[in-house]
Amino acid sequence: MTATAPTRAASPWQLRLFGTTAPRATILIRIVVGGIFLSEGIQKFVYPGELGPGRFAKMTPLPNPAAWANADGIFEIICGVLIIVGLATRLATIPMIVDMLGAQVFTKFPMAVHQGVWAYFHESRPEHGQLFGLVFLLIVGAGGWSLDALLTRRGRSPGQGPT
């Protein structure tokens, strides 16, 4: 006979952070939003000249564009996977919201200045879609078909092992 460790109930802040009341269909938004970040992160390493350090060197005034591009790619891969599986989803959205705002500032706002507002609106459609998807996930959580939901149903928060 093996003894099982009792489970501790998740604290109120853990439930707010990892809990979700969103419908199961939220998985569709997670797959699209997380999948795009995963794909874009991988492509920064597969095509470094066009999408990674080379692109960052051309489009951003940041020092050491290679380090920024690589960090961005790593964050997109890690957060993309977390969003897809629904683990720490709300936390994973935060750096990606910053990422999308950075994309707006460094790549799209200059377009509005030089080519006009309509060119900006046209070219920034993907960033706006990603940004609104991320804000949605930040507000409602991962949904019923997620690791966040599974862990909070069991009374544990992610990262909390048996006691």
Feature-to-residue mapping (PLM):
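Extended, low-polarity transmembrane helix blocks
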Residues: 1-47, 66-74, 78, 85-163
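Membrane-interface interhelical connector segments
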Residues: 45-67
